[in-house]
Amino acid sequence: EAHEGVYSRLGQEVIAAFLQNRSLHTLYLSGTPYNIQRMFDTREVFHWDYTMEQQAKQQWTSLHPNTTNPYEGLAQMNILTYDISDKMRSLTKADGLNFAELFRTETTVDNTSRFVHEADVRKFITLIGKDSNDKTQPYANAYLQPSLNHTLWYVPGVMAAKSLAEILGEDSPTNPFSEYTIVNVAGNGEAGSDRLDIYEQTRFERSALERVKTAVTQHDKTITLSCGRLTMGVSIPEWNAVLMLA
């Protein structure tokens, strides 16, 4: 199974051992090949993606009648987009709401982090929350809301995740997410550091994964905040939606 680890010392040693046996052919299998594609010529790549999978699922019965559809259990993904530019005018550009600016942070005199546009962040949280006046918003939508008990929110950066976790975790009647357990796995940016080898990066990933698994097991509603961690090579069945806020 090929991932970023093929570039590590251990990965190179394993590959070198295989190459010593010249009668072998090497097949790299990966579900997240984004960072290793440059290792191969386009003629050496077989591509099978989500769209192909769903097409095979839909066509199986007509092409292979009276046989079990091996793709039947693979979920269909629904992508929803929301235009809230009229409600967040001060942070909206020609191509839509600028999440990087909305969630921009600054360091205060006491060395803590806070949102530069905190009032707008709180406005946004209220807008998408369960009590929103706009009932098309995800957590205010009677059809969608029951499916959003455990979600992943992808935010622009580590400090944005930290500051957002503090706001979402407030025990306040004005907080539409007060009944959710907030799991911030963005950390301090350590897993993305070039100074850490693959062993250390894996350790951070496993720790984050265990925290999420514990939370979804012990709590009815959770929100996981991440700026990259647990977004590749990880399956958490309880997650049934991702909010892309970056």
Model-derived regions, located:
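Switch/connector loops and helix/strand junctions flanking conserved nucleotide-binding motifs
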Residues: 4-6, 35-40, 88-91, 191-194, ...
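Conserved catalytic network of the ASCE P-loop NTPase/AAA+ motor domain
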Residues: 17-23, 70-73, 143-146, 214-219, ...
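SF2 helicase catalytic motif II
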Residues: 1-28, 32-33
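A short beta-strand-to-loop transition that corresponds to the Sensor-1 phosphate-sensing loop
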Residues: 29-33, 83, 157, 226-229
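Short glycine-/polar-rich loops that comprise or flank the Walker A/P-loop
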Residues: 21-25, 73-77, 178-180, 237-241
